[in-house]
């Protein structure tokens, strides 16, 4: 499997971990330096994101990801795509479609997400 395929597998695992609230999988996929930039400009580190899932504050009922464009630069990969998620965050229901950018690094042979950002679309 080449690097592009490996990153796409990691992206799929990321989506499924969110959908199934699989905290251990999320922890494994997130780099210690992970930083999420939300649509509103908020920045959350790895522990903040994991805490929001552990508390039940956030959960997804549906998730889809498509239109992936992957670029690999040595041990770094950038993925641009489109996703849709439906669920609840901080007590509020959402049905969200966005373009996203995620950045992955390969450490000890494993791809880890170091950052992701999404921008809402209609």
Regions found by a protein language model. Name each.
Residues 1-122:
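A beta-strand edge to alpha-helix "cap/lid" segment located at domain peripheries
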